[in-house]
């Protein structure tokens, strides 16, 4: 059985070990590639300050590239008796290279090592989320343009209110994603700062070159203060979780709208048949299960910031084992959100729109405001026009003109989709993912 990195002469209690390790071995598989990348940057820096020879660095880099390839192919495993990904990588290096493998931990603690792994993992996941959001955004904008002239009822208080359009409906969710991406960009900028070299949270007596590892890993800058670098554990995850939650909130609302509008009582849209399921007893049913699950999963993601906040709440400065539990709720959340984005993008691309909703007389009253405004344009005071139309409705004399003339920015006749698309492009361009990608390719020699 592999020896623990911290093991001394005290016998390990197996029940205590099971309790303290928890799900770390499972969760750390998310971090394997990133742990290897961090080690490659760290040992390159160690060689530059004389703690490794050039030949030792060459051996270690070759071995780490092999381990990275295993992780990339999903073949990396954390063996029984090994606590975490850091221990497994060091064990593999030591088996292959002997004492040289034992040198990689100089000037480093598992505290800053896991901080680094989490940041490398998170920024890579943010890139994938951003790309998925952008794909959904483009589908929504295309559908908004396609159906810009198709009117639908607008609602307030779940009561029919005023004319809207499918152009507005699709476009509203597109613009919501722009704001969501601003949160994601802010989270990325906080995440893209290098904690490596903070060690256990108080630095090291080795002359570490933290600027060098920052450059090698493609970070924007450092977490300069070593105490704050450690204090940032939990805070970084919470801030990223807020960004994920804002995206999830948009998807949840869209899923609810689609389920509602797909129901027979509304009949505004038709979801793709392959995204519905049947009933075991009612042969006519086509249930919108994909969007119902999307709504539930997204609501779960919206609880993530509170979960993380409560786990890390009231901790003083320094490292505490409480923080380990955050990984269990944080790491899987990215895949869940990506799944929801993928499903929503597919459905929004395939959704069918009822182009004749307003032929139904039940929606005639949504044009009452249009009539009030027409009278006001002809010179009648607005309040008098409002009263006249109200009395006509009560007396059953109201006959609507089912035409709308909305021309101001963001209205039915002037969706401003080009401006919304420009806003999204501006946000996307502000991420600057190319820095981290170039750095990682350089480390791997690709």
Ranges and model annotations:
Residues 217-305:
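Acidic, glycine-rich loop-and-beta core segments that form the ion-binding/anion-interacting portion
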Residues 42, 63-70, 92, 96, ...:
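Generic, well-ordered alpha-helical scaffold segments in large soluble proteins
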Residues 105, 110-113, 157-164, 168, ...:
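Alpha-helix capping and helix-loop boundary segments enriched in small/acidic/polar residues
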Residues 119, 123-130, 134, 141, ...:
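Short amphipathic alpha-helical segments with heptad-repeat character
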Residues 1-203, 208-214, 221, 277-278, ...:
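A helix-coil-helix interface module used to build multimeric assemblies
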Residues 146, 183-186, 190, 219-226, ...:
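Conserved helix-loop functional segments at active or binding sites
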Residues 2-38, 99-100, 267, 282-446:
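Glycine-rich cofactor/substrate-binding loops
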């Amino acid at each position: 059985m592999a020896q623990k990195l911290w093991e001394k002469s005290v016998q390990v209690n197996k029940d205590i070990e099971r309790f303290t390790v928890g799900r770390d071995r499972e969760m750390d598989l998310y971090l394997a590639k990133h742990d290897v990348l961090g080690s490659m940057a760290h040992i390159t820096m160690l060689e530059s300050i004389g703690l490794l020879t050039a030949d030792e660095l060459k051996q270690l880099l070759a071995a780490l590239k092999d381990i990275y390839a295993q992780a990339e192919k999903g073949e990396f495993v954390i063996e029984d008796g090994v606590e975490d990904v850091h221990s497994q990588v060091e064990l593999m290096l030591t088996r292959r290279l002997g004492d040289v493998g034992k040198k990689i931990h100089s000037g480093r603690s598992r505290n800053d090592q896991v901080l680094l792994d989490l940041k490398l993992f998170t920024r890579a996941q943010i890139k994938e989320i951003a790309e998925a959001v952008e794909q959904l955004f483009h589908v929504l904008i295309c559908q908004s343009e396609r159906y810009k002239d198709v009117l639908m009822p607008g609602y307030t208080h779940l009561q029919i209110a005023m004319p809207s359009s499918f152009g507005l409906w699709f476009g509203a969710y597109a613009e919501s994603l722009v704001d969501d991406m601003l949160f994601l960009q802010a989270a990325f900028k906080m995440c893209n700062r290098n904690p490596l070299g903070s060690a256990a949270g108080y630095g090291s007596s080795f002359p570490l070159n933290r600027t060098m590892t920052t450059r090698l890993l493609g970070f924007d800058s450092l977490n300069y203060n070593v105490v704050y670098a450690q204090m940032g554990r939990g805070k970084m995850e919470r801030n990223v979780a807020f960004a994920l939650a804002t995206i999830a909130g948009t998807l949840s609302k869209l899923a609810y709208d689609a389920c509602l509008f797909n129901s027979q009582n509304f009949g505004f849209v038709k979801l793709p048949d392959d995204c519905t399921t049947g009933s075991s007893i009612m042969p006519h049913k086509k249930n919108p299960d994909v969007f119902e699950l999307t709504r539930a999963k997204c609501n779960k993601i919206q609880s993530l910031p509170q979960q993380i906040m409560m786990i890390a709440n009231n901790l003083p400065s320094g490292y505490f084992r409480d923080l380990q539990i955050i990984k269990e709720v944080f790491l899987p959340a990215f895949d869940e959100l990506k799944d929801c984005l993928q499903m929503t993008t597919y459905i929004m691309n395939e959704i069918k729109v009822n182009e004749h909703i307003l032929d139904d007389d039940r929606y005639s009253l949504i044009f009452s405001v249009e009539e009030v405004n027409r009278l006001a344009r002809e010179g009648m005071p607005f309040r008098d026009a409002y009263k006249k139309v109200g009395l006509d409705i009560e007396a059953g004399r109201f006959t609507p003109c089912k035409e709308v003339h909305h021309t101001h920015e963001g209205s039915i006749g002037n969706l401003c989709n080009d401006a919304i698309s420009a806003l999204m492009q501006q946000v996307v361009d502000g991420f600057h993912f190319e820095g981290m990608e170039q750095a990682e390719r350089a480390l791997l020699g690709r």
